[in-house]
Amino acid sequence: MANQNSDLYKQITAGSVAAVFQTTMTYPFEYLKTGLQLQPKGTAFEIILPQIKSYFVGCSALNVAAFGKTILRFVTFDKLCHSLNNNIDNNDNFQRLTGYNLLIAGTLTGIVESLFIIPFENIKTTLIQSAMIDHKKLEKNQPVVNAKATFHKVATKSTPVARIEKLLPAVKHMYQTRGPAAFVQGTTATIFRQIANTSIQFTAYTAFKRLLQARNDKASSVITGLATSFTLVAMTQPIDVVKTRMMSQNAKTEYKNTLNCMYRIFVQEGMATFWKGSIFRFMKVGISGGLTFTVYEQVSLLLGFSSRS
């Protein structure tokens, strides 16, 4: 039991370092993806591209989330593995989960992670949206307190977006202007996205691996990973777009609820809007796996334990 706990702590350490490194290195893709998703139809891409200095705005929020999420992931998954696996011997060792038990453990762990990171995702979105706003335009806008969106119509005026550049001021502003609800916006879309992520990734990876099982080489592993990432992004991007919109600073006056958000995007902006930012998300997802695995392996070696155990 002592060795098992020691290995778990080492896994958490290696996983946390890998998660923070991966989040930082791929954050420009996250910024561009979120920035595109926040733009209404007809907004030029050039509005986002030149703001290179802003490419790491909001990264601190996701790094805090990545650290906490990693701890939660290992502890939750470890507990679920013990709960779902009946093949536990006297030394309290258990065989790896397979099939539906693995899918259940992964999905439940993903939901717990998602609930944890929702406040940080909201902070990130607030900071990115703020970084994209022209300060001169903000001075002309006045806040609208009672504006409400109906199911079919947008509010006549929307709440202006504040210009905030740092983590703690963002948290303070969100609480003062929107209350505690500001940190749980987009919860429904986030949970659905996580369930879809886990299910599609598990299914797609298994399918592509079986399809290429005759080719037992590095190339097949790369192809499987890329094909899985492409499938994941293609099928879950609409949920991701809705999640981002529901986390925006003016979501409360723009959208009545998640379904209203989906409806209005479809009617007012067109079907293609649901796949905004998909290229950058694919780049992030494709690179993230390799970065995380590589850093995790190296930190595992430094800590003196096998990352495959």
Curated annotation (Swiss-Prot):
Q: Does the keyword Transmembrane apply?
A: yes
Topology in membrane: Multi-pass membrane protein
| Positions of transmembrane segments | 12-32, 47-67, 100-120, 184-204, 222-242, 285-305
| Superkingdom of origin organism | Eukaryota
GO MF annotations in UniProt: citrate secondary active transmembrane transporter activity
Protein localization: Mitochondrion inner membrane
Question: Solcar repeat ranges?
Answer: 6-83, 97-211, 216-302
Looking up SUPFAM superfamilies in the UniProt record yields: Mitochondrial carrier
Provide the alphabetized UniProt keywords.
Membrane, Mitochondrion, Mitochondrion inner membrane, Repeat, Transmembrane, Transmembrane helix, Transport
Enumerate the Gene Ontology biological process terms: mitochondrial citrate transmembrane transport; mitochondrial transport
One Pfam family name is Mito_carr
One of the record's GO cellular component terms: mitochondrion
Q: Which family does it belong to?
A: Belongs to the mitochondrial carrier (TC 2.A.29) family.
What protein name applies here? Uncharacterized mitochondrial carrier YFR045W
